[in-house]
Every structure is written in structure tokens, then in C-alpha cells.
Amino acid sequence: MTKVRLGNLYLAAAVAGVILCAVLMRAFYMPYSGFWRTVLYNILIFSWAVSVWWRILHAQTRHCLLGAAALMLFWLDIRLIRYDFAQTPEMLRRLWYAYYIPMLLIPTLALYTLFFLDRGQSAPLYKYRYMIFVFPVVLFSLVLTNDCHQLAFAFPPGQEVLGSPDYTYRFVYYLCLLWIFSCAVFTVVYLVRRCRIPHTKRILWLPLVPIFLAALYALLYKHILNVPWMHAIAGDMTVVQCLTFTATFEACIQCGLIQSNMGYATLFEVSMAKGLITDRAFVPVQLSLIHI
């Protein structure tokens, strides 16, 4: 096993350990578990965002992934505020409305990122590419102002301010679901096409596995909530969606679908050409085996 693969295994084990700690905190209801779980997930996503900043070559792709990471941090933090710090029904309701900002924009950014998978740094950008953000911005604006029109959620008469749980869904809510579902389907279809290895029938399955797990989780979510031990371990929809998004695009990076500034060690391990890379002081940091 190469040093690069061994390092990746150590990193994956560390990430799995952090997630396991967070899951155990939720399962055993440790004091302040919501706060500490959010801290752990924030550290994971922030660390991934820092790695994206250093690894991703294409500026537009890097900005999309960093924007998605910022939205995930926002989602986790407003959820913590809603459950641990919010005091009034109005504050609870408005924080709940704010969930729809990342819920709508993260799938949109995933779709937007696909525009750049086939394009180099100097390739001309699509002229109307930003139009893709108009519809989700309109939708989450309608959700945030729902108290004025109740086009997303309708509350019983006289209980609009109190935020009664006996609400009904209206057509803006279903438009939000339709947009999220459409972005997810288009992303999966595009990734399946891009994951097909040229001139073969083989497919790179790694980027598709997190999407499949996220879809399976969404389908089983109501069943999970009805089983106490499953709800305790895996009842956190926000965390699951954030982690599967991160895993999907990290898989795209590892498979080479997203260009990255990595893989030099592997290249030098298998290269038959003489070569080396030095640091700024001209001290060799990578040598090809034949050079040694």
C-alpha cells in the first residue's frame, strides 16, 4: 500500500471517529450534547472547506464548494440556536424558515458546480449561468416572509404569531420540494454520465454511493423517527444531508472529476521518468523512484 493511500485511510478513520463520537453523544443524551455535536460537525466541515481552498484549481468550482460549506455551517448553527437557545415561538418559527436558505441553495450550488466539470480554468463561462439562482432565491424569500402571506405554511386562524404545530403545507412548500428534487435528479444523471469510463462499460461508483445513501435515508426517515433507538442514532436529517453532500463532492475530487492540486506523490511513485519537486529553498520534497 502506498503512503498516499495509507494517509487517506488514516484521515478517513479520523473522520469516522469524529462522526462516531457525535453519534454516541446523541444516542446517550450527554449533557450539552447538541452544542458539542454541532462543534464537532463544524470542525469537520470547516476542515474540508480549508482543504478545498488549497486543493481545487478551478476558481469557480472552488467558490461553489466553499459557498456550500458556508451554507452547511449556517444550517448546523441555526439549528443549534433553534433547539438550544431560542425562547419564543416567533423566534423558533423564523429560525425554522431560515432552514430553507441552505436547503434550497446547497442543491443549486451542486448543480451549478456541474457546469465547470468539463471546463478548464481559461474556458469561457456560460453567459447566463447566474440565472439558476433566481428561482431558489425567490422561493426562500417567500418562505422567510410566510407570516405575511402563508403561501408556504398555513396556520390556524388566530395562531399565526404563536406558530401552531397544526399547520398545513401550501404550494410554495411543494415548489421548494420540486426544486430540491429536480436539482438532485439532474446532478445524479449528470454524474452517472461523467462517471462512465470512456471506451468501457465500467462506471466510477464512488461519487454515486453517498447520493444513494442520502436518498435511501430520506425514504426511510419517517420509519427511523418511529423507532426509538434508530431515532437516537440516525434521526438527524440536517447532519446526514450535510455529510452526504460533502462526501459526494470529496468523492468527485478523489476520482478526478473535479480538478485538484493533489496526486503528485502517487505520480512520482509510479513515474519512470527522472524528476523532482523542491520547496522554495530548493530542498527536494518529491522524487521519482528512478531518480533515487
Tell where the protein language model's regions lie, with residue ranges.
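Individual alpha-helical transmembrane segments in multi-pass integral membrane proteins
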Residues: P31-F46, I56-T145, Y174-L177, M237
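Interfacial "cap-and-anchor" motif at the non-cytosolic start of specific transmembrane alpha-helices
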Residues: T2-Y10, C21-P31, V189-G263
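Alpha-helical transmembrane segments of multi-pass integral membrane proteins
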Residues: W54-L76, Y97, R129-F133, Y167-K222
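Extracellular-loop-to-transmembrane junctions of the mid-late helices
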Residues: N8-A13, A27-Y41, V143-T187
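Alpha-helical transmembrane segments
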Residues: G7-A22, G67-F74, V134-V137, P210-F212
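Conserved small/polar residues in nucleotide/adenosyl-binding loops
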Residues: I290-I292
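Sensory modules in modular signal-transduction proteins
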Residues: C252-L287
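Juxtamembrane "helix-exit" motif on the non-cytosolic side of transmembrane helices
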Residues: C21-M30, I78-P89, V143-P157, Y217-W229
